[in-house]
Amino acid sequence: MTSLPDRGVSSSSSDPLCEGNIAPCSSSSEQKEDCSLKQSKTSILSCVFNSPFNIFEAHQDSSANKSPKSSSGSYDWLRVLRRIVCSGSMWRFLGTSKVLTSSDVWFLGKCYKLSSEESSSDSDSESGHATFLEDFSSRIWITYRRGFDAISDSKYTSDVNWGCMVRSSQMLVAQALIFHHLGRSWRRPSEKPYNPEYIGILHMFGDSEACAFSIHNLLQAGNSYGLAAGSWVGPYAMCRAWQTLVRTNREQHEVVDGNESFPMALYVVSGDEDGERGGAPVVCIDVAAQLCCDFNKGQSTWSPILLLVPLVLGLDKINPRYIPLLKETFTFPQSLGILGGKPGTSTYIAGVQDDRALYLDPHEVQMAVDIAADNIEADTSSYHCSTVRDLALDLIDPSLAIGFYCRDKDDFDDFCSRATELVDKANGAPLFTVVQSVQPSKQMYNQDDVLGISGDGNINVEDLDASGETGEEEWQIL
């Protein structure tokens, strides 16, 4: 779908402020000149007298006409400002006029204390804003691409304006793979050669049928759930597409080389304990154990597991009672963030601060790249972004999906404990619940059944349209 009404970054992922752009504020040339001078001086003063993270957005359409006088009069000041910002640890939010506050940031299970007072007294958070940006910019950023091979039998060689949900889901799954192979503390290195596992992960998300988790293969896997080139789908159908793709990919690899390309079990959580419509999704511990057993080819040992929990938390807008619960999921060490955004506009929400969601935006258009699995000298800059965008939590689409990664049995038990505590805080309206087992009548294991697919194999995905509104899905929460 169309992008959020934010101003974007360059396709090279560089910071627009470091490119000398300033915010437009008037249509007349005289007003532009005065405004430009005022902005330049004000920005300099902000850098000198304010905290390092009180830097306002400064971005301008490159096609705008510039006054000769303002160009010559403020260019030197702008160069000074650019040098100050680019050489230090300063950073800003882009997309709104809101500056970063000193409140704590929860980002994929990790807390960053940005208060200058707390930073000065706590050595672990001395450079909270800088360490957060390092973490943020190390996350895999997957965006619209153009110039790839046509998708299946279609003529689409780009996913611009319709592929944002696919790209958002790729980002979430990519983080799970990064956490699994490289750990939560991994940061993108500043020098080459890169870690082979890191390059291997990027290769899997390339834009061709040869790449395991490409947009081409996701659309093919999700065809029965309404995924098609040129069409937008909701998070529920997207989760089901991943379920199908992972299963198909696993079967193919077992036949060819006996290896697993997706190194964890996948559990799409939906339905309720009694199968009644309208109930909260239920994480069933026995089902998770069975999925891990199947992943390990019948062995009883626990395996890593990725949980995807699709939800609908309202009708036209999100029910406010769920917002505190959503925020708390980012405090879980197992957090992988949320597939969500404004209605019809998907983003990858990876953190929260106060009442704002912090996200990676897939709506930047970049050329398709081909990163070979063994090219440890590859240019990976188009897969990372240092621009943090924010969105009010009460504006996100009620149709979303939450992701969690549990490395082992202890990690899964910790997740269940935290989820149960969250249920206790929900006042009767939890995001999802946790139970030990399903009813005796449902004990016979069937992958489609335990993953929430109805007996006739049909799932109504037509209600998940571009407006973000939904119909009567069995997992809907009102």
Curated annotation (Swiss-Prot):
- The segments labelled Disordered in the record are 1-20
Q: Where is there biased composition of kind Polar residues?
A: 1-15
**Stored Pfam families:** Peptidase_C54
A molecular-function term among this protein's GO annotations = cysteine-type endopeptidase activity
GO BP, sorted A to Z: aggrephagy; autophagosome assembly; mitophagy; piecemeal microautophagy of the nucleus; protein processing; protein transport
SUPFAM superfamilies named in the record:
Cysteine proteinases
Say yes or no: keyword Flavoprotein present.
Answer: no
Expressed in which tissues = Constitutively expressed.
Q: Protein transport among the record's keywords? A: yes
Q: Where in the cell is it found?
A: Cytoplasm
Disulfide cross-links: none
Q: Enzyme class, one word?
A: hydrolase
List the active site: 164 (nucleophile), 361, 363
Keywords (alphabetical) are: Autophagy, Cytoplasm, Hydrolase, Protease, Protein transport, Thiol protease, Transport, Ubl conjugation pathway
Family to which the UniProt record says this protein belongs: Belongs to the peptidase C54 family.
Q: Assembly and interactions?
A: Interacts with ATG8.
Functionally, this protein is described as follows:
Cysteine protease that plays a key role in autophagy by mediating both proteolytic activation and delipidation of ATG8 family proteins. The protease activity is required for proteolytic activation of ATG8 family proteins: cleaves the C-terminal amino acid of ATG8 proteins to reveal a C-terminal glycine. Exposure of the glycine at the C-terminus is essential for ATG8 proteins conjugation to phosphatidylethanolamine (PE) and insertion to membranes, which is necessary for autophagy. In addition to the protease activity, also mediates delipidation of PE-conjugated ATG8 proteins.
Q: What is the official name of this protein in its record?
A: Cysteine protease ATG4B
Give the source species: Oryza sativa subsp. indica (Rice)
Q: What is the lineage of its organism?
A: Eukaryota, Viridiplantae, Streptophyta, Embryophyta, Tracheophyta
